[in-house]
Regions:
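Solvent-exposed, polar/charged alpha-helical surfaces in well-ordered, non-transmembrane soluble domains
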Residues: 48, 52-56, 131, 135
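Short beta-strand->alpha-helix linker/helix-N-cap micro-motif
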Residues: 33-37, 56, 60-77
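Residue-level preference for beta-strand/loop junctions
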Residues: 5, 93-95, 164
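Sec-dependent N-terminal signal peptides
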Residues: 4-16
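Sec/Tat-exported extracytoplasmic proteins
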Residues: 54-62, 105-107, 137, 141, ...
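Amphipathic beta-strand/beta-sheet edge segments enriched in Tyr/Trp
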Residues: 74-127
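C-terminal/domain-edge helix-coil "capping" segments
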Residues: 111-175
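A structural "domain/chain start" motif
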Residues: 18-52, 150-175
Length: 175
């Protein structure tokens, strides 16, 4: 009987102690998923490679989820700035591509952070050159961490502001 009460007391103390631990911050709970739009200007062969890069970027920063549903997304837009064939033998295709990565809220349309990367590559064909440009994106680039941290901070600020607004509106209707 003593063991039973002792076990019960220990269990109660453990439960109370765990209830006093600080909860994770909202920023640590934010889930961002990679997304490439159907209307993307990224050539089809490079889309899978780009999706893999974006997943690895998010995974490296600890916020990727395997689900396809999230309010917050990392997406990319690409622009070919310059392209030309060299007059060498064999001829090479040279292109400069800008990749702009965005983190935003698909529900509200708010953009939280963006980052531009420019890559210049040369290859035998335009398709291979584009693939090289995507391959040149380093997932360990510290600029990605800065962009993601900035987005998380802005997301938390936005959600906190909305919460305060709801509380104020709710207090107006108190009886």
């Amino acid at each position: 009987m003593k063991r039973f009460f002792l076990s019960l007391v220990v269990l109660c103390i453990a439960t109370l102690a765990s209830a006093q631990l600080p909860t994770d911050s909202l920023a640590e709970k934010i889930i961002i998923i990679p997304h490439i739009a159907i209307t993307s200007d990224i050539p089809e062969p490079a889309q899978n490679l780009m999706m893999d890069r974006m997943k690895r970027i998010l995974l490296k920063n600890g916020i990727v989820d395997t689900s396809d549903r999230s309010r917050f997304v990392l997406t990319v837009k690409s622009n070919i700035i310059n392209e030309e064939w060299t007059e060498t033998v064999p001829p090479k295709y040279v292109m400069t591509v800008e990749f702009t990565f965005y983190i935003g809220d698909v529900e509200s349309g708010i953009l939280y952070a963006d980052k531009l990367f420019r890559r210049k590559v040369a290859s035998d064909s335009p398709e291979k050159a584009y693939m090289q440009a995507v391959n040149a994106i380093r997932v360990s680039d510290p600029e990605f961490k800065i962009m993601i941290d900035k987005a998380k901070q802005r997301i938390v600020e936005t959600l906190d502001a909305r919460e305060e607004k709801l509380i104020i509106e709710g207090n107006e209707y108190d009886i």
